[in-house]
Each structure stands twice: as structure tokens, then as C-alpha cells.
Amino acid sequence: MATATYPPPPPYYRLYKDYSENPNSAPEPPPPIEGTYVCFGGNYTTEDVLPSLEEQGVPQLYPKDSNLDYKNELRSLNRELQLHILELADVLVDRPSQYAKRIGEISSIFKNLHHLLNSLRPHQARATLIHIMELQIQQRKQAVEDIKRRREEAQRLLKDAYLTLDGQ
């Protein structure tokens, strides 16, 4: 009995048999997924919503102000994290049985840091796209200038060739 190394391909390829003659014969792509979906056993949603720290059961260590100075708050949390790590080292040396409280505090600080950073992700994405688009515009302007320069050079060469041929 012969067995194949790989299973046969799914029958979807038959939907594209006339594609070379008629590209419109291919089936339409499926509609975009809306709401929640399951992928590799995990539930995901298509909505980009950053859950609040309270929803995650973590105390918020920075103000809930809408005019939050992210830079100062990140610095403050970073200093607090460094202090708590040093305190953890002291606790591990002096009172090893009390390390769990310090670990919980450090975990809370890390979660607050991550939440602040994740709240800046949309701004980062916009800034990155703006930068990429500006680079593309600059590259295209350089390409246009290069084409213009080469066109002028070609026109000059043609003019010189014409004058050379005309002078004979």
C-alpha cells in the first residue's frame, strides 16, 4: 500500500482553474471579521480597546488626569521601580519570608508602566506612519529630480550630437 508524504491539497484550488483566462472568475474574499473570534484556542476581538487597570484588577499608581504628562509619570514609576527592587534586595537579605509583598508591589509597578506605554502605542503608530510617508515623499522627489537631471543631460547630448552631425 502506497502512502503519500503529504496529504492531497484542499479542493480550493479548483475555484481558480479559469483564473488565467478570466481573473474575475475567482471567488470573492470572505468578509472581514467583526467582533470576537477564536484563534489557536484564545478569544480575540477586532476592537482596539486598552482595558483599564481597574478592569485588570491592578491599582493605578498614576493620576487619572486626561492631561497626563507621560514622560514624568514614566520617570516617576521607573524611579519607584528601582527603589522597590533595592528594597526587595534588602528584604531578601534581612527578612526572606516577606518577599512576596515586595514582589506584588513590583508587579503592580510593572503593570502600570506597561499600561502607560501601551496607551502611547496609537500615537507611536501614527508618528511612524507619518515618518514613513515623509521618507517616501522625499525619495520620490529625489527620483523626480534625478529623472529631470538625466532628461536634461540626454537633451544636451542629443543637441551636441545634432550639432556634430550638422557640422559635417
From Swiss-Prot:
Subcellular location per the Swiss-Prot or TrEMBL entry: Nucleus
GO CC annotations, alphabetized: mediator complex
InterPro entries to which the protein is assigned, alphabetical: Med7/Med21-like (IPR037212), Mediatior_Med7 (IPR009244), Mediatior_Med7_sf (IPR044888)
Highest taxon of source: Eukaryota
UniProt KW keywords: Coiled coil, Nucleus, Transcription, Transcription regulation
One Gene Ontology term of the molecular function aspect: transcription coregulator activity
Family annotation (Pfam families): Med7
Coiled coil: 64-92, 132-166
GO BP terms: de-etiolation; regulation of transcription by RNA polymerase II; regulation of unidimensional cell growth
Family per record: Belongs to the Mediator complex subunit 7 family.
Functional summary from the UniProt entry: Component of the Mediator complex, a coactivator involved in the regulated transcription of nearly all RNA polymerase II-dependent genes. Mediator functions as a bridge to convey information from gene-specific regulatory proteins to the basal RNA polymerase II transcription machinery. The Mediator complex, having a compact conformation in its free form, is recruited to promoters by direct interactions with regulatory proteins and serves for the assembly of a functional pre-initiation complex with RNA polymerase II and the general transcription factors.
SUBUNIT field: Component of the Mediator complex. Interacts with MEE14/CBP1.
Record protein name field: Mediator of RNA polymerase II transcription subunit 7a
Organism placement in taxonomy: Eukaryota, Viridiplantae, Streptophyta, Embryophyta, Tracheophyta
